[in-house]
């Protein structure tokens, strides 16, 4: 062990390293001095014991990695979305035929939701499901309203907010119908359900978690 640590450089090794060759005693003295400076708190006996058994780690430290805080992407506010007109339907896209596939998807969605619409299916069950269902793609009609000009309007529901329905009619006209003071009908495979807009002033996401109470009569 000692001969390995204090091995003198050969002439070739000295030439390759561009250093002057030194004797074994000078090499030993250099190593001891270096170890003493590197391990000042270690006693000579402990240092000697370490040399006999294993290598001495002259310098060791761990680098603490800084935890980078993940920045959450900040979404646009409702006001910013309105200003950017993100939800506006472009005039060239306001075509009834363009949204017929959406209506077909909606009908299949309702069939799956109601476990198949059969002639003996209870209307109350369908009504309860529709109250919490996503209505985008449904064909809805205004049957009653305090504003006579709304009555009779029928189309595919494209957008729903807390207070309005936006529907596209067969005449390719986009209509904005307020929920307040209006009664709507939704037809699904022969089943007709009524929606009282005044009691339906919720966002679709909020409606799915709301418990609706059955009432005998509801005024506009």
Curated annotation (Swiss-Prot):
- Keyword set, alphabetical order: Nucleus, Phosphoprotein, RNA-binding, tRNA processing
A GO MF label = ribonuclease P activity
Q: Which InterPro entries match?
A: RNase_P/MRP_Rpp29-subunit (IPR016848), RNase_P/MRP_Rpp29_sf (IPR036980), Rof/RNase_P-like (IPR023534), Rpp29/RNP1 (IPR002730)
Q: Mostly located where?
A: nucleus
Against SUPFAM superfamilies, the record matches this protein to: Rof/RNase P subunit-like (SSF101744)
Judging by the UniProt lineage, the source's domain of life is Eukaryota
Annotated GO CC locations: multimeric ribonuclease P complex; nucleolus; nucleoplasm; ribonuclease MRP complex; ribonuclease P complex
Q: Can you say where in the cell this protein is located?
A: Nucleus, Nucleolus
What GO biological process terms are annotated to this protein in UniProt? rRNA processing; tRNA 5'-leader removal
Q: Where is the PTM Phosphoserine found along the chain?
A: 10
Q: What does this protein do?
A: Component of ribonuclease P, a ribonucleoprotein complex that generates mature tRNA molecules by cleaving their 5'-ends.
- Homology family: Belongs to the eukaryotic/archaeal RNase P protein component 1 family.
Its subunit composition reads:
Component of nuclear RNase P and RNase MRP ribonucleoproteins. RNase P consists of a catalytic RNA moiety and 10 different protein chains; POP1, POP4, POP5, POP7, RPP14, RPP21, RPP25, RPP30, RPP38 and RPP40. Within the RNase P complex, POP1, POP7 and RPP25 form the 'finger' subcomplex, POP5, RPP14, RPP40 and homodimeric RPP30 form the 'palm' subcomplex, and RPP21, POP4 and RPP38 form the 'wrist' subcomplex. All subunits of the RNase P complex interact with the catalytic RNA. Several subunits of RNase P are also part of the RNase MRP complex.
Name of the protein this chain belongs to: Ribonuclease P protein subunit p29
Name the source organism. Answer: Homo sapiens
């Amino acid at each position: 062990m000692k001969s390995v640590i204090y091995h003198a450089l050969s002439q070739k090794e000295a030439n390759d390293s561009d250093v002057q060759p030194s004797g074994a005693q000078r090499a030993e003295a250099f190593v001891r001095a270096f170890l003493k400076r590197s391990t000042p708190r270690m006693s000579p006996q402990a240092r000697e014991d370490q040399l006999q058994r294993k290598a001495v780690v002259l310098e060791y430290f761990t680098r603490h990695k800084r935890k980078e805080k993940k920045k959450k992407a900040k979404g646009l506010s409702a006001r910013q979305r309105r200003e950017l007109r993100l939800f506006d339907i472009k005039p060239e896209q306001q075509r009834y035929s363009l949204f017929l596939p959406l209506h077909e998807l909606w009908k299949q969605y309702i069939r799956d939701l109601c476990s198949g619409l059969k002639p003996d299916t209870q209307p109350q069950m369908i009504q309860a499901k529709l109250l919490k269902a996503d209505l985008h793609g449904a064909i809805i009609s205004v049957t009653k309203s305090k504003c006579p000009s709304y009555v009779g309007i029928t189309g595919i529901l494209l957008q729903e907010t807390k207070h309005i329905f936006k529907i596209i009619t067969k005449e390719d006209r986009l209509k904005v119908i307020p929920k307040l003071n209006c009664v709507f009908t939704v037809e699904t495979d022969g089943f007709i359900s009524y929606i009282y807009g005044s009691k339906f002033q919720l966002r679709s996401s909020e409606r799915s978690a709301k418990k609706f109470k059955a009432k005998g009569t509801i005024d506009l």
